[in-house]
Swiss-Prot record:
Stated role: May help in the organization of the PsaL subunit.
Compartments where located: Plastid, Chloroplast thylakoid membrane
Transmembrane segments: 1-21
Membrane topology classification: Single-pass membrane protein
InterPro entries documented for this protein: PSI_PsaI, PSI_PsaI_sf
PANTHER family xrefs: PHOTOSYSTEM I REACTION CENTER SUBUNIT VIII, PTHR35775
Protein name listed in UniProt: Photosystem I reaction center subunit VIII
Pfam entry (one): PSI_8
The encoding gene: psaI
Source species of the chain: Coffea arabica
Entry keyword Membrane: yes
GO cellular component, one term: photosystem I
Keywords: Chloroplast, Membrane, Photosynthesis, Photosystem I, Plastid, Thylakoid, Transmembrane, Transmembrane helix
SUPFAM superfamilies in the record: Subunit VIII of photosystem I reaction centre, PsaI
Length: 36
């Protein structure tokens, strides 16, 4: 039962965390370069 309910929690978590990390790293990259 734990193995069955694990993906249903893990998939949305990755779907929310991964874009957040990507946007955070992108904003840090832009602030570091100060091109704009």
């Amino acid at each position: 039962m734990i193995t069955f309910s694990f993906p249903s929690i893990f998939v949305p978590l990755v779907g929310l965390v991964f874009p957040a990390i990507a946007m955070a790293s992108l904003s840090l990259h832009v602030q570091k370069n100060k091109i704009i």
